[in-house]
Amino acid sequence: MRLAALAPLFALVCAVSGSSQKSGEPLRPEWCRELPRPAYKELARVDVRGNWFEVYRIRPDVYAIYEPHQFEEVISYLIIGQRRALLFDTGLGVASIRDVVTQLTTLPVTVLNSHTHFDHTGGNAEFSDIVNEDTPFSRKNAEGQSNIYSRDALAPERICGSLPAGVRPEAYAIRPWTVSRRIHDGEHIDLGGRALEVLFTPGHTPDSLSLLDGRNGLLFTGDTFYPGPIYLFTPETDFVAYTKSVARLAELAPRLKLLLPAHNVPVSEPDFLIRLDAAVKSVQSGSVKFTVTEGHREYSFDGFSLLLSEK
């Protein structure tokens, strides 16, 4: 997820190398030049069919399913136990994430979303077992999201390379899905030999949650933290709730070995939570300066920034 994703006219200022661009090739926006991110060179890539997703083995039976060709650089996670597997987010829905999952496991798969923004629920409709929070925000989003809302995600300036065959931006929309069961804060999901604790962490959205694998020291943070500009400016964002959620996660940092965020790179150090907690407190107190960027207040810190509405 990148700051320039906020600019509706980004295509007009996007730098494309005309001298090296061959006729008929997809345009390569400026942000494509940053790929691949250096962190991915240190990870074990797993070969899968198709060109839209890249899969990386993060830990035994923990896979990051990465969408590098779209501006948000969304990352979903497949966590495999002895009896079943859990898919934490389903990405943009541009290509079939289910096809990727079935290449990695033959076990039954339960879907749990870190929150219900469209870039994390695009593949939900491919699955029959979906557990989720019960909030008005999540119930509304389960009805699907129209092309009017999501089509900009596939605008040329937000795509690096080519879309999968048959995908048309003007037809792209998020299909509705059915929730099998509602979950609760503190609930444990037993996959068989691996238990995951659900932690409600509202703020980015009312239904944001994180997922803790306490035994292995892994915390899946969703959009509560990722290394990059963290979006906290949408109407559904509650910054006060966000600060409380961050404080909750920061208390876990000494027990953790790894953070697994939902954008950009799939591995971050737990110390980021301590720094994030200090950052949001400095924003609350007014002790840190900001810049105005594309109509938002941006508070910059080492390794991430916070984007709030300009009020």
Which role does the model predict for each range below?
Residues 85, 92-93, 172-174, 181, ...:
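Metallo-beta-lactamase
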Residues 59-64, 186, 195-197:
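Short, hydrophobic/aromatic-rich segments at coil-to-beta transitions
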Residues 7, 16-18, 215:
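Cleavable N-terminal signal peptides
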Residues 13, 18-46, 228, 244-311:
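Accessory terminal helices/loops
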Residues 46-47, 56-58, 79, 186-191, ...:
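Short acidic-hydrophobic surface loop/beta-edge motif
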Residues 94-190, 227, 276-289:
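Active-site HxH/HxHxD metal-binding segment of metal-dependent hydrolases
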Residues 49-103, 211-226:
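Conserved beta-strand hairpin/beta-sheet module of binuclear metal-dependent hydrolase folds
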Residues 2-9:
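Sec-dependent signal peptide recognition
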